Design a protein with these regions (language model features):
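A short acidic (Asp/Glu
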Residues: 65-67, 88-90, 147-150, 267-268, ...
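N-terminal anchoring/stem segment of glycosyltransferases
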Residues: 11-12, 16-103, 379-518
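Active-site-proximal specificity loops/subdomain of glycosyltransferases
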Residues: 85-133, 148-159, 469-555, 561
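Short, flexible loop/turn elements at secondary-structure junctions
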Residues: 58-60, 257-262, 444-446, 523-526, ...
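Conserved donor-nucleotide/metal-binding helix-loop-beta segment in metal-dependent transferases, i.e.
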Residues: 143-193, 528-578
């Protein structure tokens, strides 16, 4: 066969609605009779083979290169242009130029095309739909991205990330580190001030998003203030942000992924570009309020860098009243249906004084029915599982590192706080951390220990670029951080039952998807020789050695170790292994097929590793207040930790067991440390060495520094070595 496009209703194949059975869609006609056009390169191309399409708008932004959209041959690329252009990069079997004349010729019997008076990207959408598209990416040439598939996680049915449901509007540019930048629609709606984000969010497992919105910097996507310019760069954090029902979002921040059920919402009115995008933003806002669609932002990396538009003031066309209008739109139907959708679209058109476009709406809905669209009108669900509150301030930290005066202020503030412990502390230096590829997770067991955070900041910011704290109460932390002026600190609530399940803190950290090679968790009372850890292999697990081995199934009512016979001990680990065994031999029912298969293969890997390391009838346990998980094991660790947490297995059992299930023990780095008990805890300096061990635990700061000897140890011995070694490491960078 030859490369070409399917002629829908050309001279060779005339299709009449009257002569067509109501049950026979256009796609079915294609299946029975496909007519192809042969272009000059004679390559085979049948559009209906593709289920995922990228529609590139070359009408509002001229296109000279679409190579950035063609990284994956599973996507068809249709470039919508007004007239033929010389586009050399659109030369593969998966790319086609679709001109206005081709649209009228090939789709001219569709009522939407008849209603159009000028070229429109609706032509590209319809071409994709009639050829059986299940996913459509709406893109433009000013933001060509490298990897559509992985950036938007199109192949996954679930993803992890953040859920935002706090303020009336969400500014994605602010979330990714730009305080004076906002989407074009917010300028039109005079909403630059109300779009200030809250830092309180939730770490969550996100359901499949109906609409996925890319966020990238370009003149088409954002506006920045002339009087307060900032660097046009987004912080390198990839976690998607799902938006709650009542929060306004922008559809003008980059490419948009529409899944099949959201195809009706792709309608654009015949109007100027900014009114088109404002219409789409407001329509999605109403549909989201009615819980018909769910929505998430994804940071995308354009192939070529760009900048925002710079404006002296807010937009000259203040339409803030429009938002009040659309917020009043309601649907009285108990069940969402096509009639409800029509009335909602009509309501948004009326709010924008575009009521004359009602005919286009009727044409669009008629064509969707004619094409054979069978989307679901069921209401979309918001995240409800595994919600853990987070005070998310990585963006503030990112901005602080680019602002010398703010950085100096925070450094001075932290140093001053630390002077309460050490009378003459060295000035804190946060400007050039030596470890930039590890996220440090610091455990704060009790609310009363939040006062140790300034000490943690003073010590660990010298080494680590990324730090997150995990403790029992988000509300208490926010109150404390406001009082202590620690607005750059990120904190997640993960201690739902004291310290017993604190291994889930790393799970939360992994779901944030920072650009790191691994995740190191430690308690606030662990004294660590970080300079010795910096050289360890970052593709291996690190965990303290020296485990106690025991028979998993042996019952001992006289057991001396209290936790073994408690609900978080033997019972929990036995139940976890029962689940693993069941999952390894069959695909579980009651979940999505993709997740069930993922669980099945994970269980097989876990049990295979565990059997070779120890044998499936035994477990090991020990205190694990310091450990590291490489990012290459991220997915397996998340599944393992959630499984053992589900069965309420405490950390001293769960983590040693998990590490044997994730990796062969030959590929594990076992840390050397001093674990202190009883009176030894009063004199930790007698067990400390700056070269032979990785850590000492516990070292209770307030208790140790109550004595002159203890204060000298912390302030003179330990910290002087800590600072010296950080400078040595920095010179090696």
């Amino acid at each position: 066969m030859a490369l070409g496009v399917i002629i829908l209703l050309g001279q060779q194949f005339f299709l009449s609605r009257k002569s067509m059975s109501p049950r026979r869609s256009i796609q079915q006609v294609y299946d029975s009779q496909v007519i192809e056009v042969t272009p000059t390169d004679n390559k085979t191309f049948v559009l209906r083979e593709f289920k995922k399409w990228i529609v590139v708008d070359a009408l509002t932004t001229p296109c000279d290169d679409v190579a950035g959209f063609m990284q994956n041959d599973q996507w068809a690329v249709v470039v919508v242009t007004e007239s033929p252009v010389d586009l050399q990069t659109c030369n593969s079997p998966g790319c086609i130029l679709f001109t206005w004349e081709m649209c009228k010729r090939d789709l001219g019997r569709l009522e939407t095309v008849q209603a159009l008076t000028q070229p429109s990207t609706l032509c590209g959408y319809l071409l994709a739909m009639v050829n059986g598209a299940k996913v459509i990416a709406d893109a433009s040439c000013d933001v060509p991205i490298r990897d559509m598939e992985n950036t938007f996680e199109v192949s996954e049915d679930k993803s992890s990330g953040l859920w935002y449901n706090t303020t009336s509007a969400f500014n994605p540019f602010e979330h990714w580190g730009l305080t004076n930048t906002y989407p074009h629609e917010y300028e039109l709606l005079n909403m630059s001030a109300p779009s200030v984000n809250s830092h309180v969010m939730y770490v969550s497992d996100l359901s499949s998003m109906t609409i996925k919105q890319g966020v990238a910097i370009s003149k088409k996507t954002c506006v920045t203030n002339l009087y307060n310019p900032e660097k046009s760069s987004l912080m390198p954090v990839n976690s998607p942000v799902a938006i709650g029902a009542n929060t306004l979002v922008s559809l003008q921040t980059g490419p948009t992924i529409f899944t099949y059920d959201s195809f009706p919402s792709m309608l654009l009115p015949r109007s100027e570009t900014r009114d088109q995008m404002l219409f789409r933003t407001l329509l999605i806002h109403v549909l989201k309020k009615m819980k018909v669609v769910n929505f998430a932002y994804y940071k995308v990396d354009p192939k070529t860098p760009s900048k925002c538009d710079v404006h002296e003031s807010a937009g000259d066309k203040d339409q803030s009243f429009v938002l009040q209008c659309v917020n009043s739109i309601e649907c009285d139907a108990n069940v969402w249906d096509e009639t409800c959708l029509r009335n909602t679209v009509l309501g948004v058109l009326e709010c924008l004084n575009l009521g004359s476009e009602a005919w286009l709406l009727n044409a669009w809905m008629t064509d969707l029915d004619f094409i054979g669209f069978k989307g679901s009108y069921e209401k979309a669900s918001e995240p409800t599982r595994n919600l853990f509150g987070i005070s998310y301030n990585f963006n503030k930290e990112f901005m602080m590192m680019q602002n010398n005066s703010e950085l100096a202020r925070v450094e001075q503030h932290i140093t001053k706080n630390f002077s309460r412990i050490c009378s003459s502390p060295l000035k804190q230096s946060m400007w050039e951390p030596v470890i930039t590829d590890i996220l440090l997770v610091v455990i704060i067991n009790y609310e009363t220990l939040y006062s140790t955070i300034p000490y943690m900041e003073y010590v660990h910011r010298r080494y680590f670029k990324y730090i997150m704290y995990c403790g029992p109460s988000l509300d208490s932390f926010v109150k404390y951080s406001d009082q202590a002026d620690l607005g750059h600190v990120t904190f997640v609530s993960g201690m739902t039952r004291s310290w017993l399940f604190m291994y889930e803190c790393v799970t939360h950290a992994m779901k944030l998807r920072l650009p790191v090679k691994g995740y190191m968790q430690m308690g606030e009372d662990v004294l660590v020789n970080t300079w010795l850890l910096a050289s360890l292999p970052k593709d291996q697990i690190w965990i303290p050695g020296g485990f106690t081995k025991r028979d998993m199934y042996k019952i001992n009512k006289l057991e001396k170790w209290y936790h073994w016979n408690s609900p978080v001990g033997q019972r929990g680990v036995i139940n976890a292994f029962a689940t693993l065994t069941n999952s390894s031999v069959s695909v579980p029912d009651g979940t999505s097929r993709a997740f069930a298969l993922k669980s099945h293969y994970f269980a097989k890997r876990f049990l295979s590793n565990y059997k070779s390391n120890l044998g499936v009838n035994y477990i090991i346990h020990r205190a694990t207040d310091l450990f590291y998980i490489p990012d290459v094991l991220r997915d397996d660790y998340i599944m393992a930790s959630e499984l053992f947490r589900q069965h309420e297995t405490m950390i001293e059992i769960a983590l040693p067991v998990i590490h044997y299930g994730l990796s062969n023990r030959k590929n594990v780095t076992y840390l050397k440390g001093a674990s202190l008990w009883a009176q030894d805890r009063l004199r930790p300096w007698t067990y400390y060495h700056d070269t032979g061990i990785h850590f000492v635990h516990p070292v209770k700061l307030k208790m140790v520094t109550n004595s002159t000897e203890g204060k000298d140890f912390i302030c003179e011995t330990y910290l002087s070595k800590y600072v010296k070694e950080s400078d040595v490491l920095r010179l090696k960078l």
